[in-house]
């Protein structure tokens, strides 16, 4: 049943599961759990949706009828990522709640972009090199800690396009072949401690609801369930749970390797299969997902970046303190001394986001300062603060 107070008596949540596979285990389980909670639910093939755009209106139709669902759970297959994400963007603009965003799905499915975002947020990953020229293979192998190495294409799923190579020549030949076939190639550190095994953490919202260990069979090093790997229940340590939640989307399967120094994120799956993890863990994962949708579908996340860009002359600027060493040790308010009033700003530090931090807070090497206001005035003032002569800065610090 729908939890009391979430929806008025005369209003029922209308839920669409976007999937081309109505007979797949995961799709059927989500449908079953939604119906048990008396939700008006349907499975919609995203390929049947048409998108209408005009200067003042948007619309979506499903097999000729208007799309009239309040929320969607996207189960977008890898081969239709582009179309599926276009659908999600359209629905989002129409106010339809989406369990995962188009941006999140696209980023998670591009292994290069995913590694960049994870690294930017200081989430541990295996050392990774994006290679465009076979002449860089030797240097990439050295960067990754030597042989063997894992070679991957940036677009792949369920272990497809992932290879383990033990020699330089084998690696170079493989990379050359992939590049000739117009594939984007990654060379990645091989984590020997996790050979043939990984941990799948199923994240829903801000918590891990289930986890399992996957093991490859025989000489296979890829542990994917779809490659006939075995699964077993796994009690996830708090350190691994924290990393998984930081890496995940709203609903995601996060694959973790057990490195010598702790967990490493291997991949984030925006449309995780439920069969293996439900069987291994004994957890009703589909039910957890449906309950999450019921609780969250009343609220829609807003992209502030898009909204702020609609105000003429105003926008957001950011400063990486590490790029401007003279700022280190100065109070954050010194960035805005020439402005009539302090702008709205935030400080990103140690994975925390602090809105309007105390102006006396001293800037550190790894800080990121984000500010919003009149772009022309902000740029002028920030340039003055960044490029202020060192002699003036020292004199001011002496006076303080």
Regions found by a protein language model. Name each.
Residues 124-146:
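Rossmann-like NAD(P)H-binding beta-loop-alpha module
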Residues 160-243, 247:
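Phosphate-binding site of ATP-dependent enzymes
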Residues 323-385:
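Cytosolic Rossmann-like ligand/nucleotide-binding regulatory domains
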Residues 118-119, 141-160, 183-194:
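ATP-grasp fold ATP-binding core
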Residues 91-93, 360-361, 378-400:
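Short, compositionally biased
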């Amino acid at each position: 049943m729908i939890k009391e107070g979430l929806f008025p008596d005369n209003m029922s949540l209308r839920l669409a599961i976007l999937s081309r596979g109505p007979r797949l285990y995961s799709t059927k389980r989500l449908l079953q759990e939604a119906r048990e909670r008396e939700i008006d639910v349907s499975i919609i093939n995203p390929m049947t949706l048409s998108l209408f755009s005009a200067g003042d209106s948007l619309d979506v139709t499903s097999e000729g009828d208007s799309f009239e669902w309040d929320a969607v759970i996207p189960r977008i297959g890898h081969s239709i990522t582009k179309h599926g994400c276009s659908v999600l963007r359209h629905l989002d603009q129409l106010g339809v709640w989406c369990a995962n965003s188009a941006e999140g799905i696209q980023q998670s499915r591009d292994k290069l972009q995913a590694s960049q975002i994870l690294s930017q947020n200081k989430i541990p990953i295996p050392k990774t090199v994006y290679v465009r020229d076979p002449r860089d293979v030797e240097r990439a192998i050295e960067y990754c800690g030597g042989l063997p190495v894992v070679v991957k294409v940036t677009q792949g799923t369920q272990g497809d396009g992932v290879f383990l190579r033990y020699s330089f020549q084998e690696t170079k030949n493989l990379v050359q072949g992939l590049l000739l076939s117009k594939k984007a190639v990654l060379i990645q550190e091989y984590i020997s401690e996790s050979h043939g095994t990984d941990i799948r953490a199923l994240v829903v919202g801000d918590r891990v609801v289930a986890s399992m260990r996957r093991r490859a069979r025989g000489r296979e090093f890829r542990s994917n369930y779809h490659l006939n790997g075995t699964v077993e229940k796994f009690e996830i340590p708090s350190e691994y749970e924290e990393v998984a939640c930081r890496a995940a989307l709203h609903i995601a399967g996060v694959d973790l390797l057990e490195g010598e120094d702790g967990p490493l994120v291997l991949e984030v799956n925006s449309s995780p299969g439920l069969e293996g993890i439900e069987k291994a863990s004994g957890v009703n994962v589909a039910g957890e997902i449906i309950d999450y949708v019921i609780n969250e579908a009343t609220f829609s996340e807003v992209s502030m970046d898009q909204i702020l860009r609609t105000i003429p002359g105003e926008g957001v600027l950011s400063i990486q303190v590490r790029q401007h060493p003279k700022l280190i040790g100065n109070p954050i308010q010194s960035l805005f001394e020439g402005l009539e009033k302090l702008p709205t700003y935030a400080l990103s530090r140690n994975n925390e986001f602090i809105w309007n931090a105390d102006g006396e807070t001293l800037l550190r090497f790894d800080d990121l300062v984000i500010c919003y206001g009149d772009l022309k005035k902000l740029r002028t003032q920030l340039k003055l603060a960044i490029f202020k002569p060192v002699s003036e800065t020292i004199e001011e610090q002496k006076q303080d």
